[in-house]
Amino acid sequence: MSGFFEELKRRKVYRVAIAYIVAGWALAQGLAQVLPVFDISNSVIRVVIALLLIGFPVALVLAWVFDFTPQGIKATPSIASGSHRRRNIFMLLATGIVISAATGFFLLPRAAARKIDKSIAVLPFENLSDEKENAYFADGIQDDILTNLSKIGDLKVISRTSVMSYRGKTPNVREIGKMLGVSTILEGSVRRAGNRVRVNVQLIDATNDQHVWANDYDRDLTDVFAIQTDLAQKIANELQAKLSPTEKAQIENKPTQNGEAYLAFIQARNLFAPEEFDKLKQAEQLYDRALQLDGNFALAAAYYSQMEAWIYRNFDKQPERAQKGRALAQRALQLQPDLPEAHWALGYWYYYGDLNYDAALKEFEIAQRGLPNNADAYLAIGAIQRRQGKWVESNASLEKAVSLNPKDTWPMQNLGQNYAMQRNFAAANRTYDRALAIDPNAFGIKELKAKDAIAEKGDFSLAQEFLAKADTIPDLSADIKNHLAEGRIQVLVFLRKFDEAAREATKVPDDALTRYPNALCGKYITIGLAKKRSGDEASARQFFENARGFAEKDIQQRPNDASAHANLAGALAWLGQKEAALAEVKRAQELMPESKDAFDGPQITEALAQIYAIFGDAASAVPILEGLLQRPSQVTVPFLKLNPVWDSIRTDPQFQALIDKYGAKA
């Protein structure tokens, strides 16, 4: 054997082997850096490695047989006998094969199985235009790139809301990647001058802050969609994401050929502010302009329809608006039947307009398949699933929405509500705390956390702290002030400070509650209860009559609204009209049975129990309450102990047994 190793040394096989390994490794590393620049798949690297491994034993044999001399390549003279020479060549070949096989066994599977983290966040693009009002255009480019990427099911794409906090900041890419849970960051800038657009982008590896590639695009305004398409395809290729034919077609689709229509569209989309009706009305004008300039602009019609659905739900329930919004959704679908955003828009009209949750879910699921990375699609699906009583599925959908939008508190707020309805207050509080770590001033989160502290433990400290601090916040909108007053009144009623509650209710002018008929009716019932507690039955009755009048007027405008009938039932009950009150609340149940809506339906069921309780009918109220305590609802033992509406049956043995039974479980 020592003779074999001496021969290896004499024939310089060691030197060739080392040189081959070093050169092969350098070649593989160089290809790994260069190939992505030319959009060549990493699978080429694996092929090169395989060829190098196959070539290794061949190189050893050639090094054994031949030698490089000043006179050229010559056969190396052998000093061994024929049998020893054949044995040595066989041993050399076997050694080379074993080394290559062992290396390939460990290296190739890892190269093949190396899982690329196919996750990306697109940071806000910097506006380099001379006209700073063109910032909306940079936002529009970023938003459209995000939308294109969100159509690729093999990617994980973080939603726009979660990246907007990085606008105008010098990014620490590693920190952002860690915060958002992504491995790749796209950042860029936009400069617009007239109809010319220049877009500069850099794709960065968030794990090491290394630039993967950069590109500049200089195009006409009408060609901006080609930039977005090219970027989406390059990013998909870099992250080894598979593009289905449908996804490829969606990405390559140009929503409009009209540059002015596109500008109006992205301005309108950028104006969407859920709580600011004035901005929404400005956006309406811009959407109208976009569709006037291009009547075939399906995407604009779809977004316009979605916004109209939101306005209809929250600000203006006029039938004309519903007709307009539905027509826009249908128009978008006629123009482009496979447009995910059009199905999304139609889904919202089934949801907000018809309360047809099955039809809404069908449309949302179509939209989600076309926008597999859109957090709002999962949020909408989760909202429908909980109304269908599919709580496990709803939790999963909302968790997915949170993962795609990790710095937006709205999905977390919805997820926390789910957990609270299921009385999993520990999970609800973890979700709220996660949201407050992102936004310590998140109004809705603080409110829910305070409410849940009462629901779980009867603890008012968070609510009182929240309400006290809210009073010091400057420039609160009238709507938020009224909402705070409603919460303050509820706390005072639970604390049995009825006179204070009545004074608080009196401070809120009626015209401030015209869009909130439930609150308007509740205002007069609260004042009536305070008068009743003080022994002023005549005044109490007058306030209950006022509440009744508001509820009846509301029913005239919303005859199929369950909450309107429940409000009327409450007013009638306090007026002593038991049969009429039961008729109204049962009508509310017909309109919103729990079998149709497992999220809001339990509130109507609880209203029925309250009507029975007002008349001292524990035998009818307690079984209803027990059912609500056994399934997701807002009913908890602390709420039953605190709410004065149960006072008429509070000492009844059946009610006390219910409190004891479920209080022990809690």
Positions of the model-derived regions?
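Terminal, low-structured helical/coil segments at or just beyond the last alpha-helical repeat
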Residues: 639-666
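Acidic, proline/glycine-rich low-complexity intrinsically disordered segments
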Residues: 88-531, 536-543, 547, 553-556, ...
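C-terminal structured "cap/appendage" subdomains that terminate the fold
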Residues: 610-643, 647
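TPR/TPR-like (Sel1-like) alpha-helical repeat modules
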Residues: 545, 586-589, 625-631, 663
